[in-house]
Amino acid sequence: MLKNHPKGLIVAFFTNMGERFGFYTMMAILVLFLQVKYGLDEKVAGDYYSWFYFAIYALSLLGGILADWKKQYKTVILYGQIIMFVGYVMMAIPSMSLYGTLGALLVISLGNGFFKGNLQAVVGQLYDDPKYAKFRDSAFMVFYMGINVGAFFAPFVATGIRNWWLETNGFIHDGSLPALCH
């Protein structure tokens, strides 16, 4: 399947798959986290979720402009990954205030903005070589499969982590309990 492709495709595949896995694991629990940790109602937590998504796509424009201006796509991608990592570490600080959490989300969205579109550009550049040009379409199919694989498994892992944590701390999660209340 990858026999006729440059080696950079497999790196891009796993990089994007890992990023999407981490991103969708967080997104699977973000609104619930905001509601439980900070007592936000559904609408306010949903608004923060929406603004976070908006920031990712708005800052992707900034990341693309920066990479085009500097002509250093891989460097911008690396900085994006580092910035996202810092944002995720900030999110992991347990005593953080709501403003700290929102700041962490902004840092994550900035890193994601530097990362998101530029990785696709690098994949396209791998196929500028005439030797690989005829494989460009299949390369993007493989590349986007990494996104789908990462996004598919993320909610299951988030649920598994939640269940493990509940059981480890002496709690039991029973999904049928809300139905018994009605």
Question: What is the role of each PLM region?
Answer:
Residues 114-130:
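Intracellular juxtamembrane helix-capping segments at the cytosolic ends
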Residues 50-68, 116:
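Central cavity-lining transmembrane alpha-helices of secondary-active solute carriers
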Residues 79-102:
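C-terminal ends and interior cores of transmembrane alpha-helices
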Residues 26-44:
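Short amphipathic helix-loop junctions that connect adjacent transmembrane helices
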Residues 56, 135-163, 174-181:
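Glycine-rich segments within core transmembrane alpha-helices of 12-TM secondary carriers
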Residues 1-23, 99:
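Cytosolic juxtamembrane N-terminal segment immediately preceding the first transmembrane helix
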Residues 102-103, 168-182:
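Symmetry-related core transmembrane helices of the 12-TM Major Facilitator Superfamily/SLC fold
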Residues 69-82, 134:
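Cytoplasmic membrane-interface "Motif A"-like loop-to-helix N-cap segments
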